[in-house]
């Protein structure tokens, strides 16, 4: 659905009054996963020249083997147990295998993807896989603005009036403004 929506925007950018050089994808948590794989799919199949990808505490690896995934097994709000359930539901039609464009870290080639902003939270089971995905993008010569936010947890920005949430939202907005210049 995400890729179809992106293709619709691309195919109809003129009637939608959208600059075709200022199309980005983004999401948080599972939405970050969808945005990342949508960028990969777009490069490989739709040839849509995305200008940016914004990945906020993204799910990136179906294997769930990082130290933070093992450490935050039962933390409140989001944890490894809930993450496992998410993957089980997401991949329920693919027993025993992970299809292409499901787990961003499984991609063999990350070259020619759009620049990225990747934010990870200190007390999040997804922290390490987000950091590893940022590293893998950098190794593919993708420009990454990585933001490892101290003292935060998965979904902290739900409390949007908290000072740290306001600060991170401002940083995200500035990253988008820079991408859209």
What is the meaning of each model-derived region?
Residues 1-181:
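Alpha/beta-hydrolase superfamily serine-hydrolase fold, recognizing
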């Amino acid at each position: 659905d995400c890729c179809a929506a992106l293709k619709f925007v691309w195919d109809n950018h003129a009637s939608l009054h959208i600059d075709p050089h200022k199309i980005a994808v983004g999401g948080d948590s599972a939405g970050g996963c969808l945005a990342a794989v949508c960028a990969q799919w777009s490069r490989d199949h739709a040839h849509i020249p995305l200008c940016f990808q914004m990945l906020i505490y993204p799910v990136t690896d179906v294997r769930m083997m990082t130290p933070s995934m093992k450490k935050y097994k039962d933390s409140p709000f989001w944890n490894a147990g809930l993450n496992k359930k998410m993957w089980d539901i997401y991949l329920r039609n693919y027993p025993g295998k992970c299809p292409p464009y499901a787990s961003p870290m499984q991609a063999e080639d990350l070259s020619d993807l759009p620049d990225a902003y990747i934010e990870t939270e200190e007390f999040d089971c997804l922290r390490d896989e987000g950091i590893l995905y940022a590293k893998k993008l950098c190794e593919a010569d993708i420009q990454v603005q990585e933001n490892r936010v101290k003292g935060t947890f998965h979904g902290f920005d739900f409390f949007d009036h908290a000072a740290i949430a306001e600060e991170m939202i401002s940083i995200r907005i500035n990253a988008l403004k820079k991408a859209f210049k």
